[in-house]
């Protein structure tokens, strides 16, 4: 869990299951906490149960099995990375559904956003249930719990048919539960990106990946352990493994372990169009993964020529740096690209000196090199990418500080590479303001990702399109050029899409708002929107191209953030519906004012 801290600092939880507890004793344990120190807190709380026990007791396996809380055979841990900006312990995984029958207890956690919650809510209420909470996690828990109840009841009837009674029925149920039945009858109804893990009170454990492979999952198993994690290097470090030892869970596949410890891979849902998320590779995932490191490096290197154009090929007076730390590997790629270009120019200059160059001339040429500095520092550990909206701007103004005199004022260009630019909050409220204090000749902000034009409904829930600086800039261009009829046309087209019957192919009608404008036009408008008041330094934006994205990350084609090509019907429905909401509430309100 410590090695996956990059996947969430808002909370953490763990659960454990004992396989051989007697009635009257707890067999399913859970601990949760909020805050960036949550991992430390939950383990400290677990260890409190062991105070006062002798080393002999702690080393006694039989004593541990019968008497020690959290000493079990099944474990599950989760780090919270908000997908909605909501906070509170009730949102921290794992979630637990209790029952007096061991086999009906279900503990669940996961990385997911479901895009058809209305449909699921309707299915549950049609069954006669009355859900207390309207959220994808809670509804998934209840839906899966209902199917688990049905699987237990199926085995109960079978046991009675075999003439079994009382405890023999319970043993039969626990020995014959088919978690694959539960997963098949549950997950066929859900639309979205997910990796869901669960454990039952009777000792079954599972992990399932969505059929589009949107969210990542890796596993390792041998004769002693079965382990699943969101990232490969976490397993490598924790269990001292090579890349080749670890497998990736396939689309729609589940890794299931029964109470006897027998692990099997089962195809629960037929694979759909392969759409593994590219933004996982750019931002979310740990950069120490072998392949992710190479991909991020290439993303940066591919931007070399466009950055050189932005600084008029003046490498002598250009300083390279990066913000935030997740952009560091892309920064290395950019510096490698600069080095290759400078080295090539050195060769050309030396050849041009002729057959008898002077030592001084050669020395001057060889002095040319990359100028890279640590210009910005993250002053405190604050994340503004996903924060409750009313506090985001205030946080952003305090996130970064600068290294003073790291560039030559009014002479040096300053190039800052970021992994991606989403809202532009930190740029506007902090970064551009503090970089301007260095008085560079020009600031070039480089994004290793393409322009983010559409929300992600599969992992990071940013439901309002007006949150994106690219969208806001495009709307401003539309208004400036008196093209607001285009917005109305898109609005009407979106309404037609969401009115289509379920199962009919949907299109993303919102794409049309971007078509009249070039990337450069949108970039210039973004600069106008994000430029702090009083800033005088010229600013230019450079984004990765879609082609560059796929060239650097060829095995993860999911690019809906940038293209609007959502792989699931639920994603398509939401992008159209959210534009309808924007048009009816924000755009019309703007016109009235």
Task: Describe the role of every protein-language-model region.
Residues 189-192, 295-316, 329, 334-337, ...:
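Phosphate/ATP-binding catalytic cores across multiple sugar-kinase/actin-like superfamilies
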């Amino acid at each position: 869990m410590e090695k996956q801290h990059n996947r969430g600092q808002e909370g953490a939880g763990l659960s454990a299951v004992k396989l051989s507890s007697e009635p009257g004793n707890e067999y399913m344990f859970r601990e949760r906490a909020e805050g960036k120190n949550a991992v430390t807190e939950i383990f400290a709380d677990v260890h409190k149960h062991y105070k006062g026990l002798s080393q002999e007791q702690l080393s006694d396996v039989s004593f541990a099995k019968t008497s020690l809380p959290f000493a079990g055979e099944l474990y599950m841990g989760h780090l919270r990375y908000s997908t909605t900006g909501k906070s509170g312990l009730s949102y921290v995984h794992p979630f637990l559904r209790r029952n007096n029958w061991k086999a009906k207890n279900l503990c669940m956690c996961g990385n997911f956003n479901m895009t058809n919650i209305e449909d699921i809510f309707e299915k549950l209420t049609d069954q006669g249930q009355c859900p207390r909470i309207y959220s994808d996690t809670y509804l998934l828990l209840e839906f899966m719990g209902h199917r688990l109840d049905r699987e237990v009841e199926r085995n109960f009837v079978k046991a009675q048919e075999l003439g079994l009674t009382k405890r023999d029925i319970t043993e039969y149920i626990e020995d014959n539960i088919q978690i694959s039945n539960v997963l098949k009858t549950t997950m066929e109804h859900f639309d979205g990106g997910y990796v869901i893990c669960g454990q039952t009170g009777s000792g079954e454990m599972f992990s399932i990946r969505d059929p589009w492979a949107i969210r990542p999952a890796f596993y390792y198993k041998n004769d002693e352990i079965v382990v699943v994690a969101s990232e490969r290097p976490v397993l490598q470090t924790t269990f001292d493994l090579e890349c080749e030892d670890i497998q990736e869970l396939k689309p729609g596949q589940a890794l299931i372990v029964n109470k006897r410890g027998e692990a099997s891979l089962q195809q629960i849902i037929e694979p759909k169009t392969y759409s593994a998320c590219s933004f996982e590779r750019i931002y979310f995932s740990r950069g120490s993964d072998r392949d992710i490191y190479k991909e991020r490096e290439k993303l940066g290197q591919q931007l070399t020529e466009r950055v050189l154009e932005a600084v008029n090929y003046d490498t002598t007076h250009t300083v390279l740096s990066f913000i935030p730390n997740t952009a560091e590997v892309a920064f290395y790629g950019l510096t490698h690209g600069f080095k290759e270009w400078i080295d090539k120019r050195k060769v050309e200059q030396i050849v041009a000196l002729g057959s008898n160059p002077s030592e001084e001339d050669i020395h001057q040429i060889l002095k040319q090199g990359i100028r890279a500095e640590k210009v910005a520092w993250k002053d405190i550990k604050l994340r503004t990418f996903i924060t409750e909206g009313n506090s985001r701007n205030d946080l952003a103004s305090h996130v970064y500080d600068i290294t003073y005199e790291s560039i030559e004022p009014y002479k040096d260009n300053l190039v800052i590479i970021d992994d991606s630019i989403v809202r532009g909050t930190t740029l506007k409220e902090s970064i551009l303001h503090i970089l301007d204090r260095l008085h560079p000749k020009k600031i070039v902000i480089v994004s290793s990702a393409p322009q983010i034009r559409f929300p992600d409904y599969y992992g990071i829930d940013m439901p309002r399109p007006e949150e994106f600086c690219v969208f806001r800039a495009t709307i401003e261009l539309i208004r400036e050029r008196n093209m607001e009829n285009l917005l109305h046309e898109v609005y009407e087209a979106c309404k037609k899409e969401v009115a289509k019957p379920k199962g009919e192919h949907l299109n993303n009608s919102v794409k049309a708002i971007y078509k009249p404008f070039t990337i450069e036009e949108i970039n210039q408008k973004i600069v106008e929107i994000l430029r702090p008041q009083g800033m005088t330094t010229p600013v230019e934006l450079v984004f990765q191209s879609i082609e560059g994205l796929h060239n650097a990350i060829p095995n993860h084609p999911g690019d809906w953030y940038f293209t609007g090509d959502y792989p699931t019907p639920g994603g398509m429905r939401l992008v159209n519906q959210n534009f309808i909401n924007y048009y009816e509430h924000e755009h019309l309100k703007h016109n009235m004012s």
